[in-house]
């Protein structure tokens, strides 16, 4: 269900996202299904003609509505595969946070009124609304994908991302969260 994400992005006035030719092609394809599922409209991004030699190179920044932005998040078939998809998802979430903070608390409250009925959570709407003023002071310093070291494996006719070794990935995650620590060793439960 993409309705809440589409509604939130539309309420923020859309997002300005850098796109490659490959992303445009796949995003336009995903827009058809995303539009059908949400009942929201979109305009396909016009593809440059001729097609660029390097389809992965960023061609420019495009203003995308909710359907387009969610479809952009769904792309997994570019050269960066599933790791690129999760990177796009993190990018969109970061842009939404920045745009919401710039819009102010009133806009955020209005978005909450619109999207809260579309989500499922154990936190009440009042609890979330009470957190918003505090959250306005936070910044997303950096994001990363996990696992950091991985391989692809076929499991029951599906391709999956599998951690190379859990121990190495736990060390990478610890380093990302807490900084370099030469003495850190994962617990025996991980090893």
Sequence positions of predicted segments:
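Flexible, polar/acidic helix-loop-strand segments at domain edges
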Residues: 6-107
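C-terminal solvent-exposed extensions
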Residues: 64, 106-109, 113-191
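Sparse, context-dependent recognition of short Cys/His-centered cofactor- or disulfide-binding micro-motifs
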Residues: 2, 55-58, 78, 113, ...
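Structured segments of extracytoplasmic/periplasmic soluble domains
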Residues: 1-20, 76, 95-103, 114-122, ...
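Short, solvent-exposed coil/turn elements at secondary-structure transition points
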Residues: 3, 23, 149-152
């Amino acid at each position: 269900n993409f309705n809440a994400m589409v509604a939130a992005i539309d309420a923020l006035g859309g997002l300005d996202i850098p796109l490659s030719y490959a992303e445009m092609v796949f995003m336009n394809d995903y827009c058809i299904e995303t539009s059908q599922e949400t009942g929201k409209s979109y305009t396909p991004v016009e593809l440059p003609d001729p097609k660029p030699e390097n389809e992965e190179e960023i061609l420019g920044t495009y203003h995308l509505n909710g359907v387009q932005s969610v479809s952009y998040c769904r792309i997994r078939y570019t050269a960066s595969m599933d790791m690129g998809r999760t990177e796009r998802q993190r990018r969109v979430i970061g842009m939404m946070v920045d745009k919401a903070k710039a819009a102010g608390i009133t806009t955020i409250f209005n978005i909450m009124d619109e999207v809260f009925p579309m989500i499922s959570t154990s936190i009440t709407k009042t609890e979330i609304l009470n957190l918003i003023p505090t959250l306005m002071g936070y910044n997303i310093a950096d994001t990363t994908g996990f696992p950091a070291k991985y391989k692809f494996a076929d499991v029951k006719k599906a391709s999956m991302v599998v951690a190379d070794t859990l121990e190495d990935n736990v060390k990478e995650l610890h380093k990302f969260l807490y900084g370099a620590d030469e003495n850190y060793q994962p617990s025996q439960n991980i090893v």
